Amino acid sequence: MKPNFSKGLIPAIVIEEGTKEVLMLAYMNEDAYEKTLETKRTWFYSRSRQSLWNKGETSGNVQYVQSLYLDCDQDSIVVNVKQVGPACHTGEKTCFHYQII
């Protein structure tokens, strides 16, 4: 089974192995997905830079892929990772650290 990339990008929800805490949301195109499978590290597509990026390539805060899950429509993916260091570029463990309610 493979994601449906007919719209170009799919959301990739990254969760932490063990706790299942949501770490971040990014987007994958087919190339990022294939590189993620090949390297077992997360690759995403930057909408602002219009290019692929490897999480932790410059910061050292890498994500080692443990498993991948497709949703029922095959147009979004959950990436289960072993996180090294914080996931958020702000230095927070997760990008979802602002509580609203």
From Swiss-Prot:
One of its GO terms (biological process) is L-histidine biosynthetic process. SUPFAM superfamilies: HisI-like. It is found in: Cytoplasm. It catalyses: 1-(5-phospho-beta-D-ribosyl)-5'-AMP + H2O = 1-(5-phospho-beta-D-ribosyl)-5-[(5-phospho-beta-D-ribosylamino)methylideneamino]imidazole-4-carboxamide. InterPro entries: PRA-CH, PRib_AMP_CycHydrolase_dom, PRib_AMP_CycHydrolase_sf. Zn(2+) binds at C72, C88, C95. Pathway: Amino-acid biosynthesis; L-histidine biosynthesis; L-histidine from 5-phospho-alpha-D-ribose 1-diphosphate: step 3/9. Keywords: Amino-acid biosynthesis, Cytoplasm, Histidine biosynthesis, Hydrolase, Magnesium, Metal-binding, Zinc. This is Phosphoribosyl-AMP cyclohydrolase. It comes from Bacillus cereus (strain G9842).
